[in-house]
Amino acid sequence: LPVGLPPAHFGAQAKKFTDYFKRDGIVEFVYRDKPYAIRITDVVCYPQAYAAAATMLHTLMDDPKAVVLDIGGFTADYLLLKNGKADLTSCDSLENGVILLYNKIRSRGNSELDLLLDESDVDAILAGRKTSYPAEAVRLVERLAQEFVNDLFSTLRERMLDLRYSKVVFVGGGAILLRRQIEASGKVGTPLFVTNINANAAGFEYLYRLEAAGR
C-alpha cells in the first residue's frame, strides 16, 4: 500500500503513519455496496509533492536546484529538490491555498460590484470560459488571482527560494487553475505543469513499483 504525507510532516510522521496501516488483522469495509476483507502486508510512505512530480524527476537530475509547488485548496506545499532528490530540510506547508483566493474574490465582488461570485464562477473566469458577468467582474477576478500568485512567490522568496532561476514543477488543482497567472508573473524561470489532478496518487503507485522492482 503506497501512501503519502505533506512534505513538512513527512520526517516526523511517516513511521507512525505506516505503522497505522500495518496493524495486524483483517481490514473489512464496504465499497460501492460490495464487502471486502483485506490484509495489508506492505506499506511505504512518500512525500506528497515529490510523488506528484515523480514522472518528471528524470528531467531534473542535472539541476542543482528545482522546486515542487503543490497548490491545493487550503495549503500550498513546497519541496526543494537537489539533483532530482528531495531535500526534506527545505519544505513546508503554507496557508496559501486557493480557498483564500475564492474568499477574497467573493468579498470584493460583493462589496465593490454587488455581485455574488461562487467558486464555479471564479473557475470559469480563470479558465477563460465565456460567462455572463460584466467585464469589470472578469478584470477583478483576474487581478486578484494575479496578486494571489505574486504574493505566494514573494513568500517563497522570503524563504530563500528564488524561482526565477530554477525549474519549478507545479502540481495540484490550484496550479492548474492559475496556470495563466503563474506564466504571466515573470517570477518563474522554467515552469513545468503536472496536469493530472490525481498526480499524488499516481506518483505513489509509480514510486512504489520502482522500489518494489529494485528489491
Predicted regions located by residue number:
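Nucleotide/phosphate-binding catalytic cleft detector across ATP-hydrolyzing
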Residues: 1-66, 86-100, 120-215
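Phosphate-handling catalytic cores of nucleic-acid transaction enzymes
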Residues: 69
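Short beta-strand scaffold segments in enzyme catalytic cores
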Residues: 76-80
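Short loop/turn segments that connect beta-strands within beta-propeller blades
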Residues: 82-84
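Long, charge-rich alpha-helical interaction segments
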Residues: 103, 107-111
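Short, basic interhelical loop/turn and adjoining N-cap
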Residues: 113-115
